[in-house]
Amino acid sequence: MTVTAGGAVLHAVPAGAQTVSESAARLTAVSSTAKAATARSARSAKTVRSAKAARAARQTSKARRAVAVARHQVGDPYRYGATGPGAFDCSGLVQYAWKKAGVRLPRVASSQFARIKRKVSWRNLKPGDLMFFNGLGHVGMYVGHGKMVHSPRTGERVRIDKLGGWRKSSFVGAVRPGA
């Protein structure tokens, strides 16, 4: 209701309605609650990012170790079914290297590809990634700079080869152990 008294306009506040100061107080409380919720959400997001970064750092550290172990086997002979030390087949080499880095892998290439969930494209390879060729019949470990370490076949030795040519055309996929 509006009443005029001596040139002044007075508004009557209906029963149960809020005054301007009460509305301002409620708005301030809502704003404070929203700010607190936003701060909690930001802290939670930061914690999630920190946890992901820590996992990625652990995986990278293990991958470096696996690459170093695999590189150390260069010159060892290929022997079908061998898991080292001293002789390896292709899947035995990568299994041995990752085991030394603290990650257990299945024994054969096809199981390694199937059981490791983190799949990686050719363009996104990182050192330590396992690369599969020839319908999962061969596996090697990416060591960076367009090269892989692998135990090729009977009569040959563990070696580091450049990627390209037939390897790219027979590439099936790659996985990232320990991720």
Language-model region placement:
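Short, functionally critical alpha-helical segments immediately adjacent to catalytic or ligand/cofactor-binding
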Residues: 69-72, 128-130
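Glycine-rich catalytic cores of cysteine/serine-nucleophile enzymes that process amide/ester linkages
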Residues: 2-3, 75-88, 133-168
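Stable alpha-helical elements in mature extracytoplasmic
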Residues: 62-66, 70, 90, 97
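Catalytic cysteine-centered active-site loop
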Residues: 76-126
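Extracellular/periplasmic catalytic domains that process cell-envelope and extracellular macromolecules
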Residues: 61, 100, 122-126, 132-134, ...
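N-terminal secretion targeting segments of exported proteins
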Residues: 1-58, 179
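Short, low-complexity, Pro/Ser/Thr/Gly-rich segments in the mature regions of secreted, periplasmic
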Residues: 173-179
